[in-house]
């Protein structure tokens, strides 16, 4: 039977193989140029985020809801959640109805929410209805 790789195994396998190759590309809005983040840089940033999450008290198996637009930090942050041993609960920015966000956060038993400054208003609006949420983390 073939070995089953976890996402972490997959990332580490390809970081070892392609460490200096671009993994992510993001447009710098100041220069209007696309800038790469290598596999190695992505892994290092993800591990720093994982360390930060663990320092905040995130425990293995805890749920973290994640609301952000598509960008490098979304990928890196999700990897950080996995490296911390937590479970990522992705939330779509297309969820315009407060009830949809509340439902997903409450029913996932998320104790933390990671968001961008652009989505923060949505999160602030639902916090009173999500008593299990202990912390909101803003990536910006």
Give the location of each predicted region.
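Structured binding elements
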Residues: 85
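Structural motif
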Residues: 65, 112-114, 137
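A short N-terminal helical cap/helix-turn-helix that marks the beginning
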Residues: 2-25, 44
């Amino acid at each position: 039977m073939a070995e089953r790789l976890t996402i972490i195994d997959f990332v580490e396998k390809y970081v070892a193989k392609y460490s200096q190759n671009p993994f992510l590309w993001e447009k710098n809005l100041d220069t209007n140029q696309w800038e790469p983040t290598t596999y190695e840089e992505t892994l290092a940033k993800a591990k720093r985020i994982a360390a930060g999450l663990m320092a905040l008290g995130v425990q293995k198996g805890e749920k973290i809801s994640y609301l952000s637009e598509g960008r490098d930090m979304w990928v890196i942050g999700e990897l950080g959640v996995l490296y911390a041993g937590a479970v990522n609960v992705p939330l779509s920015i297309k969820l315009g109805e407060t009830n949809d966000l509340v439902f997903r956060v409450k029913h996932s038993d998320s104790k933390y929410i990671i968001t961008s400054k652009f989505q923060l208003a949505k999160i602030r609006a639902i916090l009173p209805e999500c008593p299990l949420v202990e912390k909101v983390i803003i990536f910006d």
